[in-house]
């Protein structure tokens, strides 16, 4: 729970001005025990947003986040102005520099990405994109270029399939 942030905080301690730090929030992993692969509850309300950010800042050993991301927001979240007013307030307080939407697996999510670029002050959209999974990436990349919104690619190696380490003899 927050292990990656703790590790990043330790590794880059004393080097804050030399790195760009991005993290994301929405899943309430601190107050819920995860059982299996069931999705954890998502929260974007102001109280949770502030608490999640405070905890991330502590784990990352910094006083601000360069790019703060909404993790897998659904369309109803993109349309919720309160969420983005909270994030704009955090920019005003100097706790984050900008924010993004970090979208889920490649199937679907096109509308969420486009709506975020069209209607909200996002600086970037994070999406799955690789030679095997180009939807919705192609459309989001095109729209991002039109709107001057950055695209952050995740899973560029198709979860290891494109590394050459997975072959017909690999047991899954």
Question: What would you call each of these model-derived segments?
Answer:
Residues 1-23:
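N-terminal binding-site loop/beta-alpha segment at the start of enzyme catalytic domains
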Residues 3, 7, 40-48, 75-82:
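Alpha-helix N-cap and loop-to-helix initiation/capping positions
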Residues 11, 73-172:
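Beta/alpha (TIM)-barrel catalytic core signal, keyed to glycine-rich beta->alpha loops juxtaposed to Asp/Glu
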Residues 16-19, 23, 63-67, 94-98:
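Short acidic capping loops at alpha-helix termini that bridge into adjacent secondary structure
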Residues 18-30, 127:
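A short, structured active-site edge motif that brings together acidic residues
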Residues 30-43:
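Surface-exposed, active-site-proximal loop segments in enzymatic domains
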Residues 42-61, 82, 104-116:
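Short, acidic/polar
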Residues 57-76:
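Active-site groove signature of glycoside hydrolases
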């Amino acid at each position: 729970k927050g292990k990656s942030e703790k590790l990043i905080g330790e590794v880059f301690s004393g080097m804050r001005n030399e790195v760009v730090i991005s993290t994301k929030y929405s899943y309430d992993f601190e107050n819920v025990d995860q059982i299996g692969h069931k999705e954890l509850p998502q929260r974007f309300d102001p109280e949770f947003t502030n608490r999640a950010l405070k905890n991330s800042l502590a784990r990352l050993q910094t006083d601000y986040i360069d790019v703060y991301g909404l993790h897998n927001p659904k369309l109803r979240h993109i349309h919720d102005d309160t969420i983005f007013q909270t994030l704009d307030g955090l920019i005003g307080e100097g706790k984050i520099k900008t924010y993004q939407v970090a979208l889920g697996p490649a199937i679907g999510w096109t509308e969420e990405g486009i709506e975020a670029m069209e209607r909200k002050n996002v600086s970037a959209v994070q999406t799955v994109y690789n030679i095997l999974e180009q939807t919705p990436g192609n459309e989001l990349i095109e729209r991002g270029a039109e709107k001057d919104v950055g695209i952050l690619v995740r899973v560029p190696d198709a979860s290891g399939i494109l590394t050459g380490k997975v072959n017909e003899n690999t047991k899954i």
